[in-house]
Amino acid sequence: MPNVDEETLVEQGAIPPTDFHDKIERIREISDYEIEAPEDLTARLDQAISGLLLPPETLKAAAAALRVGHIVLQGPPGTGKSSLARALCEAFNASIFPVTAHEDWTVFDVIGRLELRLHSDRKEEIVPVNGYFTEAVIRCANATVRHFDEPMEPQAEWLLIDELNRAHMDRAFGELFTVLGTDSAIPITLPHQRDGNRNLVVPRRFRIVATLNSFDRQFVNNLSQAIRRRFTFISVNIPDKRPAGSMWTNADAAAPLAIREFHIVVNRVASRVANRLTSLDPTKTDEKSVELRTKLSGALSDSVQKLFDLVEQLRYAASGGRVPHLPIGTAQIIDTVELFLFRVLQDGVADANVAEVMDWAVSVKLVPLFDSDVVAPEVLKEFAEHLSAPFNGATRRELLGIVAAGMHFVE
């Protein structure tokens, strides 16, 4: 029997190609393969979210939803939606094709378009350019074939869309409504591609993992019922309120998420600042991180705890009360404490004066978040006027400035 090379087998249709960009219609050949759930999926999920503040139920719900179809992770800013999305992809052994939604998206950005290209020899050529969805599907098919030969390779590539509701989804996704809502191998027509390379079948192994900021939804585009029906929505919220009488400094591993958040913030800030300070000599990073962690847990701990007390008031404020509701995410707290620590170190602030630095950090990091908070001006004004130390200085002034400037949003 004569030797037949792999390229010949691909051309004869005996085996699928390893790159479908010029053979889009052959994706149908591998489209029926379902997602493989790793035997150690639970362990992989736990490993992937080790640094995230998530209740087990949220993780289990997201994993189950991904097994079935496309998902949207919704919640306030800074709660770890994007990190969870990446962690889920990692746990399922899928690489990601990340994009951020934009209000100007059209079907040309999502499906594809023709572009005029100027080559180095000054010749012009019209070339097809795949949109985000099309490119992600092709890459997913490529990954699936590679995974057949190399099981350690990703089994798929998934489209990760941040801030999904910033785009006009009905306008941008067009005929994708049909294929996202069925398990049937219905092809999408790609008008920007050449004849014979236009019919795209979405593999069963492909997923869209999207994030959605549920807090400022009044400032972005609402998702239609048609879009919502094609995704499972998983809420990623701030931690539940700490039990009454619990101390922020409780180091028990079984402590509630709100308490564990305090220690995660301290550790994350110490690590980030240490990396910045020792970038020219990484051998000193670990030592510096321990030093900063000790400082945050010691001399600076009172200021950090007062920040958490303030955040707790805002996060769990009751509707109609004298405290405005603002679901501040962990990421914003980390940013605030990092800025606080840097200022203390930079200015050589004495321990007796660090509270003023925390007040300043809150005024420039957290107060601007109220510019998009839906709160009656009288509530914001009363809250500012009744702030206690250390937030009765710069933080109060900035909040009252927002009230005076009319930059709040009234219900």
Which residues fall in each region the model found?
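C-terminal regulatory/interaction module of P-loop NTP-utilizing enzymes
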Residues: 1-411
